[in-house]
């Protein structure tokens, strides 16, 4: 028997020898072309290479995501109905007559339609699949799926459609007891992904232990829901713990309705108390018809103390609360500043409970509505309530129905209403309570009528107060007063000083430009010239060439180069608008009539000295100027100055040819200064009686015209 030769183990230098052999191997392979691979089967290290494609070759193609609204563009009612019927035929399911009737009534398909009502219709999986043809084309504000007998498959299909097409902002899935875990999982996905969903009504739809984690996760991470109804959803225990823990981090939910869930006074109430400690965005918490008890109310009151700005409405109707729980609530009320509605109806509070609550209500100052219906109150408790009414300046409504409040309690309430001026509604039983003395029944009726009258009186006072507040201008709004136009004097003259500073009297005001006598004489001369011109023209051109109204600020608010000359003509029909604003002083605006706003105001031009006979006494104009300043249209006022060139072909009232008027100042802007000088020239020309005088005036006018038109 031959023994195979044994190889000696590699020595310390074996690794170095192996490396040397590996380096020599490529040289040997290059020398012998037909060399076989090495006997040990090892691959060469230099033969391993990795290559990557270029950037252009990495992406072979791209697919755009499907547009969910590709079917909803320019859709018609007939198209929607036809698509729905074809889907029903394809799926071999019945058509819903109620849906077809609603589709035929829809008119505006561009906007969200008010409501899609499928309440009471039995919806199986195939029927829900056919509804996709409607949801892919139309959007709704409310989708009502109440009591539609949804199963897991149908519910998950519908919720996926509503999430994908954003079909509703308000969704009602109440009274569907068989949607199961997959249905709630799809509903949670819809709540998390749909940004438009704001209202979810899941009353009488059980949310059990294995379904609650999905909903809790959706509410904790991201949800746009503002209103959540979970009445009679079997939340007691672990579902409520998961829900309350998730809502601690939710800042969007504002209304939470948890009625009829058999919530107990220990674990469940402790979770609600912790929720109120951390969540300050919740505004309405409805806990009616549960078993909170006094022990649970203690936990809730601990959370209420932290609600300085948050909870607005707390409903504790029918929770077996007694006077012991009212002591906890009375200590918590002074700490909350946001609670406005507190409903404690149908709890055996009794007179002692109202006394425990009274001091807290008086110290609270935020409660506006208080419900104490059917709380075992008698006249003694009504007296305590009356003390609170007398001390409350904000209480709006109080419910005391279904209590044994007789004559004594009604008298206390009536006296409190004489002091209170805020209570608008006090609910009491209409029928008087039985009394041993028959006359007391009539007294109760009289007291009830007196209480009603007191509430009506407060209502009238509140309305009057609101109207006064609306009429009072705010501090940031300027007060605008319009002064009536001054009556015309017999001479038809109005001082130009009053026209500029808005003062009714002829004396100089604090904002007048000049107090010198020469200015007054110039103003009187200008006014006489204007009245003479009106007499010559006979008022025939006043209506046709009436200038547009303008608001001219007072001269004290203008710059040194913007002041108009003191001799500018003033209209007797002007209106003065006085504007005062806090911190901005007092300004006066004068409503007058001008041809058009001047392009560049000029300094006052002294009137040319023209020798003319003394003017005749002014006569009143043929027709007084009509006050059309408030009724003129801006378009008509802009079109009026354009009618003046059409009058160039008519003879002028002073007997001059129209060509002379055009040659006198062809490029003159219609400013106030040019008007004043032209009026004085026309007056002088009209009063001259000789040809020589007329020639002198024409010569002077031709010399003065270029200077006036600068």
Curated annotation (Swiss-Prot):
SMART domains: LRR_RI. Coiled coil: none annotated. Gene3D superfamilies: Ribonuclease Inhibitor (3.80.10.10). Keywords: Leucine-rich repeat, Phosphoprotein, Protein phosphatase inhibitor, Repeat. Residues 1-12, 603-624 have a biased composition (Pro residues). Residues 16-26, 512-531 have a biased composition (Acidic residues). SUPFAM superfamilies: RNI-like. Transmembrane segments: none annotated. Residues 637-649 have a biased composition (Polar residues). The keyword Repeat applies. One of its GO terms (molecular function) is protein phosphatase inhibitor activity. It comes from the Eukaryota. The keyword Magnesium does not apply. InterPro entries: Leu-rich_rpt, LRR_dom_sf, PP1-Reg/Actin-Interact_Protein. The modification Phosphoserine is found at residues 54, 60, 581. Residues 1-46, 487-677 are annotated as: Disordered. LRR repeats lie at residues 224-244, 252-273, 281-301, 310-330, 338-358. Residues 27-38, 543-565, 656-676 have a biased composition (Low complexity). Pfam families: LRR_6. Inhibits phosphatase activity of protein phosphatase 1 (PP1) complexes. Interacts with PPP1CA. Belongs to the PPP1R37 family. This is Protein phosphatase 1 regulatory subunit 37. It comes from Rattus norvegicus (Rat).
């Amino acid at each position: 028997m031959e023994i195979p030769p044994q190889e000696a183990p590699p020595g310390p230098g074996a690794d170095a020898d192996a490396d040397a052999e590996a380096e020599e191997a490529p040289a040997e392979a290059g020398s012998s072309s037909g060399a076989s691979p090495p006997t040990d089967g090892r691959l060469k290290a230099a033969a391993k290479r990795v290559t990557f494609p270029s950037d252009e070759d990495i992406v072979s193609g791209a697919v755009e995501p499907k547009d969910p609204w590709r079917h909803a563009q320019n859709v018609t009612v007939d198209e929607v109905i036809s698509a729905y019927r074809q889907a029903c035929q394809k799926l071999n399911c019945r058509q819903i007559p109620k849906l077809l009737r609603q589709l035929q009534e829809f008119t505006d398909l561009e906007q969200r339609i008010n409501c899609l009502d499928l309440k009471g219709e039995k919806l199986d999986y195939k029927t829900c699949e056919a509804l996709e043809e409607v949801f892919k084309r139309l959007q709704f504000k409310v989708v009502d799926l109440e009591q539609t007998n949804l199963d897991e498959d149908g519910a998950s299909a519908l919720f996926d459609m509503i999430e994908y097409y954003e079909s509703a902002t308000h969704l009602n899935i109440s009274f569907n007891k068989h949607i199961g875990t997959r249905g709630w999982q799809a509903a949670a996905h819809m709540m998390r992904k749909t940004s438009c969903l704001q209202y979810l009504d899941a009353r009488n739809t059980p949310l059990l232990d294995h379904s609650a984690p999905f909903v809790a996760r959706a509410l904790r991470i991201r949800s746009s829901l503002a209103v959540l109804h979970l009445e009679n959803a079997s939340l007691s225990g672990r579902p409520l713990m998961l829900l309350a823990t998730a809502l601690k981090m939710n800042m969007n939910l504002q209304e939470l309705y948890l009625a009829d869930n058999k919530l107990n006074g220990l674990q469940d109430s402790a979770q609600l108390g912790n929720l109120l400690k951390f969540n300050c965005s919740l505004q309405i918490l409805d806990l009616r018809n549960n078993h909170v008890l006094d022990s649970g109310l203690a936990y809730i009151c601990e959370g209420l103390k932290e609600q300085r700005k948050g909870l607005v409405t707390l409903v504790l109707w029918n929770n077996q609360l007694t006077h012991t729980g009212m002591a906890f609530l009375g200590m918590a009320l002074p700490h909350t500043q946001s609670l406005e509605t507190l409903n404690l109806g149908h709890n055996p509070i009794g007179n002692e409970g109202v006394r425990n609550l009274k001091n807290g209500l008086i110290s609270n100052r935020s409660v506006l509505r208080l419900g104490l219906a059917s709380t075992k109150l008698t006249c003694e408790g009504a007296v305590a309530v009356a003390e609170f009414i007398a001390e409350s300046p904000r209480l709006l409504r109080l419910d005391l129905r279904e209590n044994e409040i007789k004559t004594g309690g009604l008298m206390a309430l009536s006296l409190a209403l004489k002091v209170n001026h805020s209570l608008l509604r006090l609910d009491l039983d209409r029928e008087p309570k039985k009394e041993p003395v028959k006359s007391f029944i009539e007294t109760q009726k009289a007291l009830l009528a007196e209480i009603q009258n007191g509430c009506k009186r407060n209502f009238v006072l509140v309305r009057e107060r609101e109207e006064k507040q609306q009429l009072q201008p705010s501090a940031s709004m300027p007060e605008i007063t319009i002064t009536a136009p001054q009556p015309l004097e017999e001479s038809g003259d109005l001082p130009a000083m009053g026209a500029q500073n808005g003062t009714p009297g002829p004396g100089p005001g604090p904002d007048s430009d000049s107090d010198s006598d020469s200015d007054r004489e110039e103003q009187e001369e200008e006014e006489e010239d204007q009245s003479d011109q009106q007499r010559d023209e006979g008022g025939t051109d006043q209506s046709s060439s009436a200038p547009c109204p303008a608001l001219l600020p007072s001269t004290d608010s203008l710059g040194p180069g913007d002041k108009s000359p003191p001799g500018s003509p003033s209209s007797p029909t002007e209106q003065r608008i006085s504007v005062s604003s806090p911190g901005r002083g007092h300004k006066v605006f004068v409503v007058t009539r001008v041809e058009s706003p001047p392009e560049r105001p000029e300094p006052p031009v002294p009137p040319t000295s023209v020798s003319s006979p003394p003017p005749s006494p002014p006569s009143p104009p043929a027709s007084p100027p009509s006050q059309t300043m408030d009724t003129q249209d801006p378009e008509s006022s802009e079109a009026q100055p354009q009618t003046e060139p059409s009058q160039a072909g008519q003879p002028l009232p002073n007997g001059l040819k129209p060509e002379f008027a055009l040659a006198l100042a062809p490029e003159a802007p219609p400013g106030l200064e040019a008007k004043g000088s032209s009026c004085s020239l026309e007056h002088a020309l009209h009063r001259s009686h000789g040809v020589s005088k007329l020639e002198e005036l024409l010569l002077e006018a031709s010399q003065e015209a270029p200077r006036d038109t600068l």
